[in-house]
Amino acid sequence: MRVDLNCDLGEAFGNYSFGGDHQIIPLITSANVACGFHAGDENVMNETVKLAKAHNVAVGAHPGLPDLKGFGRRNIDISNDEIYNLMIYQLGALQGFCRIHQVKINHVKPHGALYQMGAKDREIANVIAQAVYDFDPSLVLVGLANSYLISEAKNVGLITASEVFADRRYEDDGQLVSRKESDAVITDTDEALKQVLKMVKENKVISKNNKEVTLQADTICVHGDGEHALLFVSKIREILMKEGIDIQSL
């Protein structure tokens, strides 16, 4: 049994520091690097790629909507052509830094509202998947388990990784509880660990309404901007190893 452990990193920009990347990155196997639209900038991207390489962590693109103020978590009325182009633009930006540091982009995981839009809307999911395929058909597309991001990525011929969340609660249909709700994020470490083990070992999660939902767990996400992110990552890694589960990149 194996699973990937990923975290969204490189989300500082300019004079604004964000997250504990240097502490978290030695504990994970895949880094989703912000590409400048919702967070990150050219200097942060460069340093994050260098940091990932130094710790033998797989580098992935984390493209988002052009919304620094809202951290890419607000829906934007945007055309399919614009979604396609912003995907290509951000992938190209990260590829430049990967090239000079002689590492390869391994995967792509949309960020925030773009991720949720693709998870719930088949047409948007197809546009995202097609952009990734056109850029590099060997890339892995990471998306919410059981969502349109996964099914549409498979339809266009991409390798997929079904993602589950250690620190998020689920709806009965397998979607994530909206961050607008007060109980959307799990802050209790024991609750998060219990959820992780059930998802990885049983391919199931208990929804907020106490319904058992089936899902595939190829990769576990812990958010680097969370108050308890470092503690979560440390404890999750510890319990996975204790259970004999291999932690490997995608």
Swiss-Prot record:
Its EC number is 3.5.2.9. Transmembrane segments: none annotated. It holds the Pfam family LamB_YcsF. Keywords: ATP-binding, Hydrolase, Nucleotide-binding. It catalyses: 5-oxo-L-proline + ATP + 2 H2O = L-glutamate + ADP + phosphate + H(+). SUPFAM superfamilies: Glycoside hydrolase/deacetylase. GO terms for biological process: carbohydrate metabolic process. It comes from the Bacteria. GO terms for molecular function: 5-oxoprolinase (ATP-hydrolyzing) activity; ATP binding. It is an enzyme of class 3 (hydrolase). CDD domains: LamB_YcsF_like. NCBIfam families: PRK05406.1-2 (NF003813), PRK05406.1-3 (NF003814), PRK05406.1-5 (NF003816). Belongs to the LamB/PxpA family. Catalyzes the cleavage of 5-oxoproline to form L-glutamate coupled to the hydrolysis of ATP to ADP and inorganic phosphate. Forms a complex composed of PxpA, PxpB and PxpC. HAMAP family: PxpA. This is 5-oxoprolinase subunit A.
